[in-house]
């Protein structure tokens, strides 16, 4: 039996696992099997909070909405191409195809809107769990190349050249059915994005994986910038805790990072002389964009963003930056430099971290020669981080919220074994 897909529900109280022989649902605290079916090769599974409604992808183009309590099918939908991702909240059902996103009213299953996107084979997309701030985030569609565009010489004859995914994020209001902002998050293509439970914060990572950024939603102010590491790494999963004070990040390395989102003491209209005010004054524009004008902290593309009228001229940016002189030494020095250079003086590293155990080659998971993939979430009841890996293991790590530092593995289970209560506790309290 192979594990095809794994995900937490919106409040991290349940874990859903899709396999080649049905699917399983577990409670996370305490860890126990809640539901299981052994029929069907399930490609994708998504839950709606703690309800009995489950969305399943049974074949590449077919979606089934199921009531697990009644063991009945609510509806089935077939799409023109392969379904790459499914997102749910109490108002909307989102279906992500490679170049389209379908929005449904989850109460009536009526199709409300179809969004045309640039090719998005990795299904980079995030839907807020909030019914009030019901925002959808996805890569900004790229304009078609001009008629004079020449594809690379290595492109096969007759094929269509596809540009890399944008580093910009489009914020779409799924209640008003309109795009409301674009956030220029990275110069490199996006690799992972996530929204917090209130739909007020957006975390982004590019395909370099060295810098994690957090923006306010929907206005797009850059609030935090974190360094995961200096070497490139593929970001697999990012998750805010329920109070949005911590951000957990997993990648193709074995280290899981936790970053602290300390609330700024200054007001949103802070003076540009303060570090917070300086960041915000340079990250917002009249259109709500958040330009990335010089990321020299490890997430650097081959060139700057194309010049845009609302961003102003380069000399204008330098003049504005040179006027942002703070009271501290770092602020004084950084104020005379372009924003990307000044950010090198203020790197924000992880607050806590821990390393995953080495993959168990004898487990029933779909382990290959590539890096161990992982999905992370934080418990809403205890200071613990939950991690599910592609080899079928579920880990629980305890963290010290006051001191941070290295976390401790306390529990380990398998999501692929047949027992109702699985695994063992690493430490017996």
UniProtKB/Swiss-Prot annotation:
It is a peripheral membrane protein. Transmembrane segments: none annotated. InterPro entries: PROPPIN, WD40/YVTN_repeat-like_dom_sf, WD40_repeat_dom_sf, WD40_rpt. WD repeats lie at residues 1-36, 69-114, 139-182, 185-225, 230-269, 309-355, 367-407. One of its GO terms (biological process) is autophagy. The keyword Nucleotide-binding does not apply. Residues 262-275 have a biased composition (Low complexity). It is found in: Preautophagosomal structure membrane; Vacuole membrane; Endosome membrane. One of its GO terms (cellular component) is vacuolar membrane. A motif (L/FRRG motif) lies at residues 226-230. Residues 262-308 are annotated as: Disordered. Pfam families: PROPPIN (PF21032). The keyword Repeat applies. Keywords: Autophagy, Endosome, Membrane, Protein transport, Repeat, Transport, Vacuole, WD repeat. PANTHER family: WD-REPEAT PROTEIN INTERACTING WITH PHOSPHOINOSIDES WIPI -RELATED (PTHR11227). The N-terminus might form a beta-propeller domain involved in specific binding to phosphatidylinositol 3,5-bisphosphate (PIP2), leading to the association of the protein to the membrane. Belongs to the WD repeat PROPPIN family. Component of the PI(3,5)P2 regulatory complex. The PI(3,5)P2 regulatory complex regulates both the synthesis and turnover of phosphatidylinositol 3,5-bisphosphate (PtdIns(3,5)P2). Necessary for proper vacuole morphology. Plays an important role in osmotically-induced vacuole fragmentation. Required for cytoplasm to vacuole transport (Cvt) vesicle formation, pexophagy and starvation-induced autophagy. Involved in correct atg9 trafficking to the pre-autophagosomal structure. Might also be involved in premeiotic DNA replication. This is Autophagy-related protein 18. It comes from Neosartorya fischeri (strain ATCC 1020 / DSM 3700 / CBS 544.65 / FGSC A1164 / JCM 1740 / NRRL 181 / WB 181) (Aspergillus fischerianus). The gene is atg18.
């Amino acid at each position: 039996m192979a594990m095809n897909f794994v995900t937490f529900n919106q409040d991290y109280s349940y874990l859903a696992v899709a396999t080649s022989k049905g699917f399983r649902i577990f409670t996370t605290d305490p860890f126990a099997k809640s539901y299981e079916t052994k029929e069907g090769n399930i490609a994708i599974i998504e839950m709606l909070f703690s309800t009995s409604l489950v969305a399943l992808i049974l074949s590449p183009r077919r979606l089934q909405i199921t009531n697990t309590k009644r063991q009945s099918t609510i509806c089935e939908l077939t799409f023109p191409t392969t379904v790459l991702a499914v997102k749910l909240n109490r108002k909307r059902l989102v279906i992500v195809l490679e170049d389209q996103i379908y929005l449904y009213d989850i109460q009536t299953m009526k199709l409300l809107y179809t969004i045309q996107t640039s090719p998005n084979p990795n299904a980079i997309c995030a839907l807020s769990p909030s019914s009030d701030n019901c925002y959808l985030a996805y890569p900004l569609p790229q304009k078609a190349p001009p008629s004079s565009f020449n594809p690379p010489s290595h492109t096969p004859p007759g094929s269509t050249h596809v540009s890399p995914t944008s580093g910009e994020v489009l914020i779409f209001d799924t209640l008003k059915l309109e795009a409301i902002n674009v956030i220029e998050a990275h110069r490199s293509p996006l690799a992972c994005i996530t929204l917090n439970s209130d739909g007020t914060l957006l975390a982004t990572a590019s395909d370099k994986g060295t810098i994690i950024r957090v923006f306010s939603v929907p206005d797009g102010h850059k609030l935090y910038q974190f360094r995961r590491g200096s070497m490139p790494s593929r970001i697999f999963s990012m998750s805010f805790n329920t109070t949005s004070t911590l951000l957990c990040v997993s990648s193709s390395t074995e280290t899981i990072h936790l970053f602290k989102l300390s609330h700024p003491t200054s007001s949103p209209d802070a003076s540009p002389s303060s570090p917070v005010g300086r960041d915000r004054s340079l990250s917002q524009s009249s259109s709500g964009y958040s330009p990335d004008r010089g990321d020299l902290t490890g997430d650097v593309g081959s060139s700057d963003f194309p010049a845009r009228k609302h961003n102003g001229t380069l000399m204008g940016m330098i003049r504005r930056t040179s006027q942002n002189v703070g009271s501290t030494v770092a602020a004084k020095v950084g104020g005379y430099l372009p924003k990307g250079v000044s950010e090198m003086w203020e790197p924000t590293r992880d607050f806590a971290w821990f390393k995953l155990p080495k993959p168990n080659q004898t487990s029933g998971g779909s382990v290959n020669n590539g890096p161990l993939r992982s999905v992370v979430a934080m418990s809403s009841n205890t200071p613990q981080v939950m991690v599910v890996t592609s080899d079928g293991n579920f880990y629980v790590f305890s963290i010290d919220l006051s001191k941070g530092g290295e976390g401790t593995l306390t529990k380990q289970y398998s999501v692929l074994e047949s027992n109702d209560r699985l695994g063992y506790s690493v430490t017996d309290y």
